[in-house]
Amino acid sequence: YFQSGVAVPLFSLYSKQSIGIGEFLDLIPFARWACFCEMNIIQLLPVNDTGAESSPYSARSAFALNPVFINVQSVEGSSEFSDEIREGKLEFDALENIDYYKISTWKRRILRKIYDLNYKSIKKDEVLLGWIESNGWAKAYCVYCTLKAQNGEASWKDWTNYKDPTEKDIEKLWVKYGKDCLFQAWMQCIAEMQFNAAVAEISKLGLRLKGDIPILINEDSADVWAERRYFSLDDRAGAPPDMFSYSGQNWGFPTYRWDVVEKDDFRWWKARLAQASKFYHAYRIDHVLGFFRIWSIPEREVTGIMG
């Protein structure tokens, strides 16, 4: 059975309706083009939240979507800031390259203004509250993002407090910083709705969306911060020396403590794959071999030689 498709990073897929970078809703016109070309599959690079990082493979959450891909004009309440949004679009459209950090910062600022203006109704939104309850990773992620912002985006390892939080700590912080935490959840809820709208159109056209799941996760992430027991912070993953790199590779990501993961019935990985299945008809794990063996390097090493 012959299959044809296209692999594309979402950030490169920007259209006339998007602002400075590809967005979830840009998948809709792209899917129509792919259908016209008689393609079957659209494959994306990871679309998880990377914070200030531009690499899609350096996520700060294995579950959360990247708010930079939200189409702000489609968000309820955005009309109050139409002039500011229009000015931002003109500025970013004039750039030759994607200014990832600037666009990400600008979008979060606009979304925060919309959120603050409509906070009284948003905090009672049953859809949002239901989304929080149905996503077990949400509170830890939202608290992590809130604390990270309060600490000038520094790594959790450099925070003064809450470097190793308990579940009670996370619940307490969720209440203490309720408005800021809810803002993070609200952005995620919007991102999911827009992504789901695009996926629905892709499915309607008879196409399939394929995702990309990096097997590793950034040390400075909500997952490593809140689920520390699953990760070995004394080790870094990489590759041994070969004909392409005499010193090997050190990717800088912690390895898994598979004995702990297994003892917990692979709960975290099951949840991660279930999250991906909400959006993708298929997905690639990069790289699946890492489930069986991986080059592990002592944390203090710079190269991959001593693995």
Identify what each model region corresponds to:
Residues 288:
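Short acidic/histidine-rich active-site segments
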